[in-house]
Amino acid sequence: METVAGKSSLLSDHPQYSGPLGVTGAAAANAVVSKADLVLAVGTRLEDFTTGSWTLFDPDTTFVGINAARFDAMKHQSLPVVADARETLLELGKELEGWSVDSSWREHAVACRKDLETFVSSRIVDDGVWPPSYAQLVGLVHESATAEDYVLTAAGGLPGELNINWMSKGIASFDCEYGFSCMGYETSGAWGAAMARPKGEVYSLVGDGSYMMMNSDIYASVLSGHKMILVVCDNEGYAVIERLQVSQGGASYNNMLADSAGTGTDARVDFRAHAAAMGAETFEVSSLDEFAKALVKARAADRTAVIVTQVRAKDFTEGDREGWAKVGAHLVTFREWDSLILEGVFDATENPGTRIGQRAIEIK
C-alpha cells in the first residue's frame, strides 16, 4: 500500500493492491497493516496522517526504515537502512529470491483489495443528484485518463478524494501537494507538470477557493503552449475549512459565501468567463453527462482547457475511522472572546489567550 506522497508508486491493478493507508486512507489498506508483523517503510516519514498517530499497527510490529534521511529511517525504533530506496529493494529482492509469504496472507490482501474496489465503486457511482460529489467527478476524470496522463491536486477536500478514489493507471502519474496544502499549487503545479511531461494530458482538480488564490498561471500556460486540463469544483466557499470548524463543535463562521456576503450582495465569480479571458478553452457543465463530454472536448483542445462544475459542499469521502487523529477543541473559543469584548466584559487590548485560559479553568 501507499502513502499520499507515494501514491502512484504502485499500480492499482495489482491483485494485492489495497489502497492508501492512514487517517485519509482506505479501510482496506488499514486492515492489512493492522495484522502485519513486519513493515517495510520505504521513503516515508511515518507522520501521523500515515500512521494514525501510531494506532494502525500491532504494538509488536517490527519496522524496517528504508530512507536516505537517517532521522526518518530510525523512527519508531525502526531497524534503519540509510540508503537509496530503489537500490535497497533490488538488493532485498535478490536475497529473498525463492521465498514467499504464507498463502493465507496473500488471500487476506486480495480480499481487502476487493473491499477497496467495492468502496470506491459505491462512491463514484452516479446517484442522479445534482450537484455531484467530488468522488463522482474523480471517477469520470479517471475514466477519461490513460496510463500516460497525470493528475494533480493540493488543498481542500480534493486530496482526500483523490487519495482513496483515484486508482493509478501509470507509475509516477499522481501529485498531491499535501505537505502544506498549498492553495494555488493546483494551477502552477499543473503548468510545471505540463512542461515536464511531453506525453499525456495533465489533469488538475481545484476548488473555487484555491482558484481564487492563484489562477494567473492559466494565462501563462496558454502563453507558453503547455496545455493542462483544469477542473474547477465550485462548492461556493471554503467548505473543508467550514467542515473542520463544525466537526469540533464550533459554529460555522465566514467560510461559505452564503454566510459571508454583505446585505443585498450576491458576489459570485463567473469562473468560465474568467478563464476564457486568460485564453483558455472553457466549458461549464450542469450534469455528469455534460461533464464527461466536456472531458472529451478538453482532451481534444489545442490549449489549456478549464471545466467548471458545481459540487456538493458537504459530501466528502471519509477516511478510515480506524485511523485515529486528534484535533483539539477549545473550551472557550475566540468567538466567545469577541462577544465578551462587545459586551464590555473584557478590554480589547488584553491578551485573549490569558483570559481564555482563565475561563477554561472556570468552566472545568
Language-model segments: which ranges?
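Short internal beta-strands
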Residues: M1-V4, V64-N67, L230-D234
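Short glycine-rich anion-binding loops that position phosphate/pyrophosphate groups of nucleotides
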Residues: G6-K7, L38, T44-E47, A69-R70, ...
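Thiamine diphosphate
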Residues: S18, V23-T24, F57, A73-M74, ...
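Glycine-rich, acidic loop regions that bind phosphate or pyrophosphate groups
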Residues: G6-H108, R299
